[in-house]
Amino acid sequence: MFFKSMGATATDHAALAPYTEALSPGQVETIFQRALKNQASPQDVRQFNGHMQLEMARMSTEDGLVMQLHPGSLRNHNLEVFARFGPDKGFDIPTATEYTRNLQPLLQAYGRHPRLALILFTLDETTYSRELAPLAGVYPALKLGPPWWFFDSLNGMHRYFEQVMETAGLYNTAGFNDDTRAFASIPARHDVWRRLSANWLAGLVARHILDMAEAHAMAADMACGLARGAYRLDQ
Protein backbone atom coordinates (compact mmCIF):
# COMPACT_ATOMS: atom_id res chain seq x y z
CA MET A 1 0.00 0.00 0.00
CA PHE A 2 3.02 2.31 0.32
CA PHE A 3 3.25 2.95 -3.41
CA LYS A 4 -0.47 3.63 -3.67
CA SER A 5 -0.24 6.08 -0.78
CA MET A 6 2.42 7.96 -2.76
CA GLY A 7 0.15 8.26 -5.80
CA ALA A 8 0.94 5.13 -7.81
CA THR A 9 -1.94 3.80 -9.93
CA ALA A 10 -0.32 0.82 -11.68
CA THR A 11 2.42 -1.79 -11.54
CA ASP A 12 4.49 -2.82 -14.56
CA HIS A 13 6.00 -6.26 -15.15
CA ALA A 14 8.46 -7.28 -17.86
CA ALA A 15 9.10 -10.92 -18.74
CA LEU A 16 10.48 -12.80 -21.70
CA ALA A 17 7.33 -14.95 -21.65
CA PRO A 18 4.00 -14.32 -19.86
CA TYR A 19 4.29 -17.65 -18.07
CA THR A 20 2.24 -18.18 -14.91
CA GLU A 21 2.09 -21.14 -12.54
CA ALA A 22 0.53 -21.74 -9.13
CA LEU A 23 2.98 -23.34 -6.69
CA SER A 24 2.32 -24.62 -3.20
CA PRO A 25 4.02 -22.86 -0.26
CA GLY A 26 6.29 -25.87 0.10
CA GLN A 27 7.37 -25.72 -3.54
CA VAL A 28 8.06 -22.00 -3.29
CA GLU A 29 10.17 -22.46 -0.17
CA THR A 30 12.18 -25.29 -1.73
CA ILE A 31 13.00 -23.24 -4.83
CA PHE A 32 13.80 -20.19 -2.72
CA GLN A 33 16.25 -22.11 -0.57
CA ARG A 34 17.98 -23.48 -3.66
CA ALA A 35 18.23 -19.95 -5.03
CA LEU A 36 19.83 -18.70 -1.80
CA LYS A 37 22.52 -21.35 -2.29
CA ASN A 38 22.96 -20.37 -5.95
CA GLN A 39 21.67 -23.81 -6.95
CA ALA A 40 18.45 -22.84 -8.74
CA SER A 41 17.93 -24.54 -12.11
CA PRO A 42 16.44 -22.83 -15.19
CA GLN A 43 13.20 -24.70 -14.45
CA ASP A 44 13.26 -23.34 -10.89
CA VAL A 45 13.63 -19.82 -12.26
CA ARG A 46 10.75 -20.31 -14.71
CA GLN A 47 8.44 -21.72 -12.05
CA PHE A 48 9.32 -19.09 -9.46
CA ASN A 49 8.80 -16.25 -11.95
CA GLY A 50 5.48 -17.76 -13.01
CA HIS A 51 4.35 -18.03 -9.40
CA MET A 52 5.37 -14.43 -8.70
CA GLN A 53 3.21 -13.20 -11.58
CA LEU A 54 0.27 -14.89 -9.87
CA GLU A 55 1.25 -13.27 -6.58
CA MET A 56 1.41 -9.85 -8.26
CA ALA A 57 -2.10 -10.37 -9.61
CA ARG A 58 -3.29 -11.40 -6.15
CA MET A 59 -1.77 -8.28 -4.59
CA SER A 60 -3.46 -6.12 -7.22
CA THR A 61 -6.81 -7.55 -6.13
CA GLU A 62 -5.96 -6.33 -2.62
CA ASP A 63 -4.53 -2.86 -3.26
CA GLY A 64 -6.37 -2.04 -6.49
CA LEU A 65 -3.25 -1.13 -8.47
CA VAL A 66 -3.66 -1.81 -12.19
CA MET A 67 -1.32 -4.61 -13.32
CA GLN A 68 0.52 -4.14 -16.63
CA LEU A 69 2.39 -6.97 -18.35
CA HIS A 70 4.97 -6.28 -21.08
CA PRO A 71 6.40 -9.62 -22.28
CA GLY A 72 8.29 -10.73 -25.35
CA SER A 73 11.51 -8.71 -25.55
CA LEU A 74 14.87 -10.49 -25.68
CA ARG A 75 17.13 -7.94 -24.04
CA ASN A 76 20.71 -7.12 -25.03
CA HIS A 77 20.71 -9.30 -28.16
CA ASN A 78 24.19 -8.16 -29.24
CA LEU A 79 26.54 -9.49 -26.58
CA GLU A 80 29.53 -7.47 -27.80
CA VAL A 81 27.64 -4.20 -27.41
CA PHE A 82 26.37 -5.37 -24.02
CA ALA A 83 29.91 -6.20 -22.85
CA ARG A 84 31.30 -2.85 -24.01
CA PHE A 85 28.50 -0.46 -23.13
CA GLY A 86 26.08 -2.24 -20.79
CA PRO A 87 22.33 -2.88 -21.04
CA ASP A 88 19.62 -0.98 -22.92
CA LYS A 89 21.66 0.19 -25.90
CA GLY A 90 19.12 -0.54 -28.62
CA PHE A 91 19.52 -4.30 -29.04
CA ASP A 92 16.23 -5.44 -27.49
CA ILE A 93 14.48 -7.67 -30.05
CA PRO A 94 10.87 -8.99 -30.11
CA THR A 95 10.25 -12.71 -29.75
CA ALA A 96 7.34 -14.98 -30.64
CA THR A 97 5.08 -14.99 -27.58
CA GLU A 98 2.34 -17.40 -26.47
CA TYR A 99 -0.41 -16.07 -24.20
CA THR A 100 -3.32 -18.52 -24.16
CA ARG A 101 -1.67 -21.34 -22.24
CA ASN A 102 0.89 -19.22 -20.39
CA LEU A 103 -1.74 -16.97 -18.83
CA GLN A 104 -4.35 -19.63 -18.13
CA PRO A 105 -3.40 -20.19 -14.46
CA LEU A 106 -3.51 -16.45 -13.73
CA LEU A 107 -6.78 -15.89 -15.61
CA GLN A 108 -8.39 -18.96 -14.06
CA ALA A 109 -7.56 -17.57 -10.63
CA TYR A 110 -8.21 -13.86 -11.13
CA GLY A 111 -9.54 -13.19 -14.64
CA ARG A 112 -13.06 -12.61 -13.35
CA HIS A 113 -12.06 -10.95 -10.08
CA PRO A 114 -13.84 -7.57 -9.78
CA ARG A 115 -10.77 -5.85 -8.30
CA LEU A 116 -8.19 -6.98 -10.85
CA ALA A 117 -7.42 -4.81 -13.86
CA LEU A 118 -4.79 -6.46 -16.07
CA ILE A 119 -3.50 -4.64 -19.16
CA LEU A 120 -1.63 -6.82 -21.65
CA PHE A 121 0.87 -5.64 -24.25
CA THR A 122 2.61 -7.56 -27.01
CA LEU A 123 5.57 -7.36 -29.37
CA ASP A 124 4.17 -10.28 -31.37
CA GLU A 125 1.51 -8.92 -33.71
CA THR A 126 0.46 -12.45 -34.74
CA THR A 127 -1.20 -12.79 -31.33
CA TYR A 128 -3.56 -9.83 -31.77
CA SER A 129 -6.46 -11.64 -33.42
CA ARG A 130 -5.52 -15.23 -32.55
CA GLU A 131 -5.05 -14.93 -28.76
CA LEU A 132 -5.28 -11.47 -27.23
CA ALA A 133 -8.56 -10.26 -28.70
CA PRO A 134 -10.44 -13.48 -27.79
CA LEU A 135 -8.98 -13.47 -24.27
CA ALA A 136 -10.01 -9.84 -23.73
CA GLY A 137 -13.48 -10.72 -24.96
CA VAL A 138 -14.11 -13.30 -22.24
CA TYR A 139 -12.16 -12.22 -19.14
CA PRO A 140 -13.61 -9.05 -17.56
CA ALA A 141 -10.36 -8.24 -15.73
CA LEU A 142 -8.35 -8.12 -18.96
CA LYS A 143 -7.83 -5.19 -21.30
CA LEU A 144 -5.46 -4.87 -24.23
CA GLY A 145 -2.85 -2.16 -24.15
CA PRO A 146 -2.14 -0.01 -27.20
CA PRO A 147 0.48 -0.85 -29.85
CA TRP A 148 3.81 -0.97 -28.05
CA TRP A 149 7.39 -0.07 -28.91
CA PHE A 150 8.07 -1.13 -32.52
CA PHE A 151 4.37 -0.88 -33.37
CA ASP A 152 3.79 2.55 -31.80
CA SER A 153 3.61 3.92 -35.34
CA LEU A 154 1.20 4.81 -38.13
CA ASN A 155 1.18 1.35 -39.72
CA GLY A 156 1.43 -0.42 -36.36
CA MET A 157 -1.67 1.36 -35.09
CA HIS A 158 -3.55 0.63 -38.31
CA ARG A 159 -2.81 -3.09 -37.98
CA TYR A 160 -3.89 -2.98 -34.32
CA PHE A 161 -7.29 -1.51 -35.19
CA GLU A 162 -7.84 -4.04 -37.97
CA GLN A 163 -6.81 -7.11 -35.97
CA VAL A 164 -8.05 -6.35 -32.44
CA MET A 165 -11.27 -4.37 -32.53
CA GLU A 166 -13.57 -6.75 -34.38
CA THR A 167 -13.18 -9.52 -31.79
CA ALA A 168 -12.18 -7.74 -28.59
CA GLY A 169 -14.33 -4.66 -29.04
CA LEU A 170 -13.12 -1.11 -28.47
CA TYR A 171 -14.14 -1.06 -24.81
CA ASN A 172 -11.95 -4.02 -23.96
CA THR A 173 -8.89 -1.96 -24.85
CA ALA A 174 -7.03 0.54 -22.69
CA GLY A 175 -6.90 3.47 -25.09
CA PHE A 176 -3.49 5.09 -25.39
CA ASN A 177 -0.99 5.56 -22.58
CA ASP A 178 2.34 7.35 -22.12
CA ASP A 179 4.47 4.21 -22.13
CA THR A 180 7.77 5.96 -22.82
CA ARG A 181 10.80 7.44 -21.14
CA ALA A 182 11.19 9.87 -24.06
CA PHE A 183 8.99 12.56 -22.56
CA ALA A 184 9.40 14.95 -25.49
CA SER A 185 7.75 12.37 -27.77
CA ILE A 186 4.50 12.17 -25.80
CA PRO A 187 2.55 14.92 -27.65
CA ALA A 188 3.56 13.54 -31.07
CA ARG A 189 2.63 9.99 -30.09
CA HIS A 190 -0.80 11.06 -28.88
CA ASP A 191 -1.29 13.11 -32.05
CA VAL A 192 -0.59 10.08 -34.25
CA TRP A 193 -2.91 7.89 -32.16
CA ARG A 194 -5.75 10.40 -32.33
CA ARG A 195 -5.38 10.87 -36.09
CA LEU A 196 -5.34 7.11 -36.68
CA SER A 197 -8.33 6.69 -34.34
CA ALA A 198 -10.26 9.31 -36.28
CA ASN A 199 -9.32 7.66 -39.57
CA TRP A 200 -10.50 4.26 -38.32
CA LEU A 201 -13.77 5.68 -37.01
CA ALA A 202 -14.33 7.60 -40.25
CA GLY A 203 -14.10 4.32 -42.15
CA LEU A 204 -16.78 2.81 -39.93
CA VAL A 205 -19.03 5.82 -40.52
CA ALA A 206 -18.44 5.69 -44.28
CA ARG A 207 -19.51 2.03 -44.29
CA HIS A 208 -22.59 2.88 -42.17
CA ILE A 209 -21.41 0.72 -39.28
CA LEU A 210 -21.48 3.76 -36.95
CA ASP A 211 -23.36 7.04 -37.12
CA MET A 212 -21.65 10.37 -36.50
CA ALA A 213 -22.84 10.69 -32.91
CA GLU A 214 -21.45 7.27 -32.04
CA ALA A 215 -18.15 8.05 -33.75
CA HIS A 216 -17.81 11.37 -31.89
CA ALA A 217 -18.37 9.64 -28.55
CA MET A 218 -15.90 6.88 -29.38
CA ALA A 219 -13.30 9.40 -30.58
CA ALA A 220 -13.37 11.11 -27.19
CA ASP A 221 -13.02 7.76 -25.45
CA MET A 222 -10.10 6.74 -27.65
CA ALA A 223 -8.35 10.05 -27.02
CA CYS A 224 -8.73 10.03 -23.25
CA GLY A 225 -11.69 8.21 -21.71
CA LEU A 226 -10.56 4.62 -22.23
CA ALA A 227 -7.16 5.26 -20.65
CA ARG A 228 -8.66 7.09 -17.69
CA GLY A 229 -11.02 4.19 -17.11
CA ALA A 230 -8.43 1.45 -17.61
CA TYR A 231 -6.03 3.06 -15.13
CA ARG A 232 -8.84 3.94 -12.69
CA LEU A 233 -7.86 7.60 -12.64
CA ASP A 234 -11.37 8.75 -11.81
CA GLN A 235 -11.85 6.45 -8.81
Residue ranges: model-predicted function:
Residues 1-6, 50, 58-63, 206, ...:
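Extended recognition/assembly regions associated with phosphoester-bond processing machinery
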Residues 68-72, 119-123, 144-147, 170-189:
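Short acidic/histidine-rich active-site segments
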Residues 1-7, 107-111, 134-139, 164-169:
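Acidic (Asp/Glu)-rich catalytic clusters
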Residues 170-171, 188-235:
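Mid-to-C-terminal alpha-helical segments outside catalytic/metal-binding sites
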Residues 5-9, 63-65, 114-117, 140-143, ...:
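Short, well-ordered coil/turn segments that N-cap beta-strands
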Residues 21-23, 77-86, 128-136, 154-162, ...:
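Histidine/acidic-residue-rich catalytic or RNA/ligand-binding cores of hydrolases
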Residues 9-127:
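Divalent metal-binding pocket/active-site signature
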Residues 124-126, 144-162, 210-233:
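C-terminal helical cap
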